[in-house]
Amino acid sequence: MKILLIGYGAMNQRVARLAEEKGHEIVGVIENTPKATTPYQQYQHIADVKDADVAIDFSNPNLLFPLLDEAFHLPLVVATTGEKEKLLNKLDELSKNMPVFFSANMSYGVHALTKILAAAVPLLDDFDIELTEAHHNKKVDAPSGTLEKLYDVIVSLKENVTPVYDRHELNEKRQPQDIGIHSIRGGTIVGEHEVLFAGTDETIQITHRAQSKDIFANGAIQAAERLVNKPNGFYTFDNL
């Protein structure tokens, strides 16, 4: 499989290493600013890469969105987070002409977490719910795309939900419909996501901890391996 990388930060550098270990080939890289240290052919436009089988994106909205407005037809794996609604609308439009896969978190364990959460929410309907995510001190967006995904699962199963991002400004007791959303940034934390169900005299915590960023890179590669054989359409872990 011949792979075009969109972005060449820490994540796509891991994708390159792991993909080559699996026998795949990196045929090019698209970056905001070309760098002499990048060990692959650099391009400005997706359509310029004639021999790619798939593109894997671990970048940012500033790089990705202009590329999505260009004319190209290439299976696309997208892991960029930020400006989610705009991104999903654009990917849905593109999926009419090419297979597109999107996940805010490329870990299959996180996908499993969403399924566990979907089963737990109806069972614990009268429990308060708090969501917490923790990442390294260089992560820019908050809350993480994964935490937003967990929140979306809850919203799909509960009515009149209210996200609460900054409780100290409210100066009032917690309301039953509140969903607390908390972000922690520090050190080299790879990624942690926790759902707390707090009831009367008991709590339940569901946690996913990433031990290495390789799980995200491998998840993207595995998605690409499946996507190249799919018809046009929008794919997630649910239907890939």
UniProtKB/Swiss-Prot annotation:
It is found in: Cytoplasm. Disulfide bonds: none annotated. Its main location: cytoplasm. (S)-2,3,4,5-tetrahydrodipicolinate binds at residues 136, 145-146. InterPro entries: DapB_C, DapB_N, DapB_N_CS, DHDPR_bac, NAD(P)-bd_dom_sf. Its EC number is 1.17.1.8. Belongs to the DapB family. This is 4-hydroxy-tetrahydrodipicolinate reductase. It comes from Staphylococcus aureus (strain MRSA252).
